[in-house]
From Swiss-Prot:
Protein name in the entry: Cytochrome c-554
Record function comment: Monoheme c-type cytochrome, that is particularly expressed when cells generate energy via aerobic respiration.
Compartment(s) where it occurs, according to its Swiss-Prot or TrEMBL record: Periplasm
Coiled coil: none
PROSITE patterns attached to this UniProt entry: CYTCII
Gene name for this UniProt entry: cycF
Pfam families given in the database record: Cytochrom_C_2
InterPro entries on file: Cyt_c/b562, Cyt_c_II, Cyt_c_prime, Cyt_c_prime_subgr
Amino acid sequence: MRPIPALALTFSLVAMPALAQDARQIERMIEGRHGLMTLMAHELGKLGGMAKEETPYDAEVAGKAASNLSALASVISPELFPKGSAVGEAEDSEALPAIWEKPDDFAQKISGMEEAAAKMQAAAGTDLASLQGAMRDLGAACGSCHETYRQKD
């Protein structure tokens, strides 16, 4: 075997496990994002039902749901969106390439969502009107990020 092709073959065999590991790490990040969003949706469902007056307002339930939501929101960070995890690059991803094109704006939207979740935590157990106001702000914060950075279904 000639030296150059042998070297290329050796390099490719050595690099393949690293590439597979990177792909698995990206897959895990996407799974983690989906799990996190599912948990947030669960808590938002409780709060949204009360805000829309579809379920009776319960200060204790609202406070706990808002506390959980705020804790979950604090976990979201740009690090959960590594390069290579965009729609078309990774299976099951809904992350648009704009995340990596406008990283500062993306990080700012995450911070806005965290702030809105913290305000929800402070308001949810107070009364229905406070919950409803905080829900509008939280919905706007979530929507602004999803509108720009998430592929529509």
